[in-house]
A protein has these predicted regions:
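Glycine-rich, N-terminal phosphate-binding loop of Rossmann-like dinucleotide-binding domains
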Residues: 85-86
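Short, glycine-/small-residue-rich phosphate/pyrophosphate-handling segment
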Residues: 111-148
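N-terminal beta1-alpha1-beta2 submodule of the flavodoxin-like/Rossmannoid cofactor-binding fold
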Residues: 1-80, 90-92, 97, 101, ...
Length: 162
């Protein structure tokens, strides 16, 4: 794998996905980019038990696209882009769709990774594929919750034949 052409882009509200992204980037010597919303999420926004919380409202509208704080990911410089996020309502938060729709991922390999308190990827990859150009290769990665060593992460990346 050409490590100089790899980016780990991630969205994290509580720090769990940030830690996973940083560990992955360190293990494969990749650059890191944080996907940030223009309006940061508050703890109240993330209350999944409240049907009127910001995250609940956004996730109940599959066409909703939260604005990004910036579009400085320099996608053109990378061949492989890991995209990480927490699983919300069994799929990726809609800000991931915003990110994927905001750049030209043509000819890129996109490898998903996620963190989750209990659910798996579900239909995440299929839902995100719709936000990518047809010639972008989307790979459903794995959950990177806790306990993966740098060697485990490198082995996983090597198994992807990037």
């Amino acid at each position: 794998m050409d490590m100089n052409k790899t980016l780990v882009a991630y969205f994290s509200c509580t720090g769990t996905t940030r830690r996973a992204a940083q560990a992955l980037a360190a293990a494969v010597d990749a650059d890191v980019y944080e996907i940030r919303p223009q309006i940061p999420y508050t703890p109240a926004d993330l209350d999944w038990r409240n049907k009127k919380s910001r995250s609940s409202v956004e996730m109940n509208d599959p066409d909703f696209r939260p604005a990004l704080a910036d579009k400085n990911a320099a996608i053109d410089a990378y061949n492989t882009i890991f995209v990480g996020f927490p699983i919300w309502w069994y799929v990726a938060p809609t800000i991931i769709n915003t990110f994927l729709e905001s750049g030209d991922f043509s000819g890129k390999k996109i490898v998903l990774f996620a963190t989750s308190g209990g659910s798996g990827f579900g239909k995440t990859a299929a839902a995100l594929k719709k936000s990518l150009s047809p010639d972008a290769a989307l790979v459903e990665g794995k959950l990177l919750n806790t306990g993966l060593s740098p060697a485990d992460l490198r082995a996983w990346c090597q198994s992807l034949a990037l």
